Structures are given as C-alpha cells and as structure tokens.
Amino acid sequence: MINKNKTRIGSIHEVNGSDFVACLISEAEGFKPEITIDDTIVRVAQVGSYLTIKQSGPDILVIVESMWFDQNNEGKQVMMLRVNPLGEFTSETGFQRGVTHFPTLGAELHLMSGSRLEKIFSRHGTGDFNIGRLSSFEDVNVALDASAFFGRHAAILGQSGSGKSWMVASLIQSALKSMPNAHIILLDPHNEYSSNNSFTNTPVFPADKTRCVSANELEIPYWLLSYEELIELLVDKEEEYASLQIAFLRGVVLDLKRDSNDSLHFGQITVDSPVYFSLEELYKTFKKYNERTIDFGKGRTALTGKFDSLLIKLESRLNDTRYDFLLRPTVRNATNTLNDLTKEFLGLSKPTSAVTIIDLSSVPHDVLPTVTAQIGRLAFEFNFWNPRCREFPILLVCDEAHTYIARERNTSGHKSARRSFERIAKTGRKYGVGLCIVSQRPNDLSETVLSQCSSYFCMRITNPIDQEYIRSLVPDAAHGILDALSSLSQGEAIATGEAVPMPLRLKVNAPNPPPNSQNVDYAGMWSKKNPHVVEVDEIVKRWQLQER
C-alpha cells in the first residue's frame, strides 16, 4: 500500500468548471522534485503528468496543464499548478470520464502510481491491442478500445517526418495480432506499405494476411459511377446547355443499363444501379442526336449541336490513358464481374486476406480523387446492402487524405471524393464502415470528415494554423496537453477521444518491420564510393508511358 503522506504534493486553492488551481507544498513541508513510487522515479507535477485529488467520495483524476511561481499572503514564493479534470475513480467501474463531485478548497493533491494508471488502460482497452507506452510512465502500456477506434472514426495527424506511417503500420500490425479476422482497406498513395520493404526486404504485414493490388489492376469501371458522378465526369455545369445535357444523360444511361441487362431479369433498374452499360453506345447516342437534322439536312432539331461540349469532354477523357482504369476496362466489362471485384477489394477472394493494400502510387495526382471516391463508395455500398453488415465491419485507412478529401478544391474528382467519404463519416458507423484519416495538413481536410472522428492521434505539428484547427476539434480537457504539439519527438503522439480513457501523451511502438517511409539518406548516397548508375533512358521511358 502506498503511503498517502508520501504521495501528497499540494492542495486545491481554486475551483472552476473546467480547471482547478493547486498550490504545492513547500520544501519545509517535504517537497521533493522527484519521488520514488513502486520502484519508479516520478517527476513531481511535470506538465502532461497525471495527479489525483483526494477527499471524501471518489478520487478525481487530473492532468497538469501548467505550473508557475507565485507569492502567498506571507510574501513567500510558492509553486502553483493548473490542472484539468479528466474523470473519477469509482469502486464500481474503476474509472469513468467526467466529474460529478467537484473538489472543495483544501482538497489534497497526490501523485499517481504507474500501477493505478495501468488498471485504467487494462479495463478500457481491447485485449492485446497495445499501441505504445505513456511518455510520462514508460512502464505503462497504452491499449485502445478497438471498437471505438475503428468503428467511430479516427484521425492520425502530424507533419511530414513526425511518424504517421510508423503509427499506421504499428496499429495494423497490432490489430492483426489481436484481431486476425479484420477487414482493413489501406489506401497507399506512396507505396509505403504494399511492396517489400527496401530496408529489410520483409513485407510490412504478414504475407498470409495481406493482399496488395495496384489501382490499375483493381480496375474500377465507369459503370459503377453514380449518376451524379457521371454528370461531374462528363458535363460542364457552367455550359449554356448543361441542364439539357444532364436531363438527356439520365435517360440515355437508364435505357442503356436496362437494355444491356435485360437477360439478367433484375426487375427494376435505376440510373444508379451498379450494372454494365456500353460507354461506346453512350457516345454514339449523343453524337447521333447532336448531328441529327430535318428537311434533308436543311433544318436543325431541338437537340442539334447541344451536346458539343459533352462529346468533346468525353473524347478528351477517352484519349487520356490515365483514365483507362476507369473508362477502358479490360476485365470488368460485364455486370457479373462486380462479384469478383468486390471479393478482391474486401480480401474475400481465395486466399482470403485481412488487409487489402491498394497501391495508388501510379495514379496521377489529378486522377487520384476520382479513384479514391470509387473505393470509398464501394466499401460503403457493400455494407449498406449487406443485411448482416454488423457482423462484417470494414475499416478504410486513408493515407495522405488531404490530397483527395480536400475541404475547398472543386474539381469533379474532389467533389466526388468529398461526397463519398463525408457519407461514410456521417453514417458509416451504422453500417459497420469506419474511417482512419491520416494527414499532414488537417486544415486542408474536409471539415465534415474530420469533425466526425471520435478519436485523434496528434503527432508533431509546428504550423500554427493546423495547431489551432486541432484545438477546435478536441475537448477542452485536452487543450493543455496540446501545447506540446510542436515539441513531440518522432513517433510520439497526443491521443484524445473515445479510443483512450483520457487525453494522454504516448510513445508509439516501433513497427516491426517498418514501412518504406524513411527519409532519403542524402549524406550516405552522396558520399558513396561506387554510386548507383542512373538509367536515364529507362526513367524517361517510364515518364513518357506514365508507368511507374
């Protein structure tokens, strides 16, 4: 049993609704800057550490926000603390968020033991889903509530080089150990996870649980696009005849879908049904009505010349090889191929996999939003129509999310991606579709998506605009600990939200093996005695063919 007199370090002098002010005991009363508890040396009241307030009723857990010197009524210098309340210890449940019994003036302030903190995490976390250790208590493992993290959306935010890729790899590795039947889809824009690691020549995730596919191999065909997405792809809404083109497009697509699938006896087919239709026939139909004349070529119909811009836009897309995965499918060119696409996408094709890594590194930057929009929509639609969706939860990990789920960019692809992921953010948890957003520019992300996240893992961020934006997202109790954002070390994070029992600062477990995200070794490469021979001809050929 820990001696209460040994852990007492001060008393409460001021109580507000959101924070308390405490005065530390003086050196004459036994103050020491460091105290040993459970064979562990504890620094007294360092910023970001945890303390307890003791009086009759449940103990209150608080976190230190700041400390300073002041003068008491006798003119003597005293040490003061500002602490934020996090929750209460109860005999029934161990620990619960929120404070119902506020302390009175004079209540004792005590140090926390590592064993007591360990109990909080062991009761809150899920099995062996450990992701790191407390920065202030390195012996205390941090376990997450997996259902809250995966099912209620989470965000991993931090500037380049802060360790986001490490954390993603570590999280998934830990999840696969404790939850081997996971269904995780990882969008990998920089090929950091999908190929063998160039440093250890070892796959980042177990090979028997992982399927790696490129966006081109996956082949997400145009006929899966919704009617709204087809409009954004083909119609210039600022054009004079845009309304006519939109209305005519609806009728043509619906007729083509019904005619192409008549033998399948689907019954009712809508303009949004994911069934095959011929893009060539669509083009021919618009061209026919655009060129139709009357009176032996002397007169024009109401539609003559009204589809010029749509035809030009469609021809432009068809001639752009970057859109071949979408507009010129070689495998997904029949309605029944959707079954195989879905199985491959979700890791259900033989052999099955727990993680599907979609390598997006070969996808051009301006086409990326269109690709990711379809991936997000496929995941949502599958479980939306799955009557047992609660038994098949899916997680979408969106690395570099700001490049395709952007707040303000208004290209057709960005609008489509924003709409797709905002729908998941708002209603995905009802159908077992979760998001993990990973970004170095939180202020550039869709506000709707980020605000729907229930857990935030904030790594080093020095940009003042991004720091302020993060503060606007998290609860007030975490604001003090967020002051450390710019001083976090690589691989260190501040965690808040429902996946953790309280705001905390932790050191993320190093992934083993790590992703292929290490910085380029300029000094090493430039000082080599036998440098690598650059194959300029091969590189230029790849560039010209748009193949990586």
Residue positions per predicted region:
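Hydrophobic residues in beta-strands of the RecA-like P-loop NTPase core, especially within AAA+ ATPase
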Residues: 187, 398, 438-439
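Basic- and hydrophobic-enriched, low-structure N-terminal and domain-boundary segments
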Residues: 1-157, 171, 389-392, 445
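P-loop NTPase motor domains
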Residues: 191-195, 201, 222-420
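Glycine-rich phosphate-binding loop of nucleotide-binding enzymes
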Residues: 128-216, 495, 526-527, 536-537
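Conserved AAA+ ATPase small/helical "lid" subdomain
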Residues: 241-265, 483-514
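Conserved P-loop NTPase motor module
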Residues: 491-548
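Conserved ATP-driven motor cores of ASCE-family P-loop NTPases powering translocation/secretion/packaging/pilus
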Residues: 422-427, 431-507
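Conserved AAA+ ATPase "SRH/arginine-finger" region at the nucleotide-binding site
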Residues: 212-224, 456-465
